[in-house]
From Swiss-Prot:
Gene Ontology molecular function, alphabetical: electron transfer activity; heme binding; iron ion binding
Protein name, per record: Cytochrome f
GO cellular component: chloroplast thylakoid membrane
GO biological process terms, semicolon-separated: photosynthesis
Bilayer topology annotation: Single-pass membrane protein
Cofactor(s) named in the record: heme
Lineage: Eukaryota, Viridiplantae, Streptophyta, Embryophyta, Anthocerotophyta
Source species: Anthoceros angustus
């Protein structure tokens, strides 16, 4: 009896250890996949996502150009929360090539570069109706010391092709670096995977070209997907092997003559990156009040002029009748 209990205990212990190990492995794989997705590449490799030329660095890996749009209020008051709406349009019916070569839905991501002093609004300052529109999005600062640069993604494109950032405007009364001025806002938006990794290597979401001029001797399909293309170099007689990962489709065949840099595959990329900008005015309350008082005084002056004119006309009419 004692032996049975010991055996059962050992079996349960082994089962728990295996289960925990499996969960750890799965968790590591999932989070590794997420960590290798944008915008983490930009955060790791660039101090600032916007270069001196105005180009946002995401374009270094996402080579196709696609549209993106941003909508912000024309002006905002100090210490108020407003929406910055980033639109990343694309055909939600299309599928992209995943890292394993299979087809799947597109993700989207965005980077929002705000003026100094503007930052992500705290949760307790965001109105309930705005929270409902934001959904389950998680925003983070590009750097701990760059609270004015926000990134989000990757998130499912079908659900979040329109991303709403809750932004808190600065208050010049408490923030000496903030001023009542017109400010630029920059945005970069992406849909789908990139074509180039930060180390310069290609992903499987791009065109693969021939590395040499020659004749295709053999095309071998690899067991785990992808191809090995054996090319007889016509210049020196050597054989060159070009590797194509799972995903891109071949557009060449055995016996075909090719030239260096000639495409061996189609371009599977259906996504792309775009950037845009907008302007926003940090408005002084006293200026607004002064403007309203000015308009009120103009309206009152017009009313008094009309009344005075009518009074003058009555006097003239009375004198004529007399």
């Amino acid at each position: 009896m004692q032996n049975r209990k010991t055996y059962a205990y050992d079996w349960i212990k082994k089962w728990m250890i295996k289960s925990i190990s499996t969960l750890i492995i799965i968790n590591t794989m999932v989070w590794s996949s997420v960590s290798e997705a944008y915008p983490i590449f930009a955060q790791q490799g660039y101090e600032n996502p916007r270069e001196a030329t105005g180009r946002i660095v995401c374009a270094n890996c996402h080579l196709a150009k696609k549209p993106v749009d941003i909508e912000v209020p024309q002006s905002v008051l100090p210490d108020t929360v407003f929406e910055a709406v980033v639109k990343i349009p694309y055909d939600t019916q299309v599928k992209q090539v995943l890292a394993n070569g299979k087809k799947g839905a597109l993700n989207v991501g965005a980077v929002l570069i705000l003026p100094e002093g503007f930052e992500l609004a705290p949760s307790n300052r965001v109105p309930p109706e705005m929270k409902e529109k934001i959904g389950n999005l998680y925003f983070q600062s590009y750097r701990p010391d760059k609270k004015n640069i926000l990134v989000v993604g990757p998130v499912p494109g079908k659900k979040y092709s329109e991303i709403i950032f809750p932004i808190l405007a600065p208050n010049p009364a408490t923030n000496k670096d903030a001023h009542f001025l017109k400010y630029p806002i920059y945005v970069g938006g992406n849909r789908g995977r990139g074509q180039i990794y930060p180390d310069g290597s290609k992903s499987n979401n791009t065109v693969y070209n021939a590395s040499t001029t020659g004749i295709i001797k053999k095309v071998l399909r690899k067991e785990k997907g992808g191809y090995e293309i054996i090319i007889d170099n016509t210049l020196d007689g050597r054989q060159v092997i070009d590797i194509v990962p799972p995903g891109p489709e071949l557009i060449i065949s055995e016996g075909e003559s090719i030239k260096v840099d000639q495409p061996l595959t189609n371009n599977p990329n259906v996504g792309g990156f775009g950037q845009g900008d907008a302007e926003i005015v940090l408005q002084d309350v006293l200026r607004v009040q002064g403007l309203l008082l000015f308009f009120a005084s103009v309206i009152l002056a017009q009313i008094f002029l009309v009344l005075k004119k009518k009074q003058f006309e009555k006097v003239q009419l009375a004198e004529m009748n007399f």
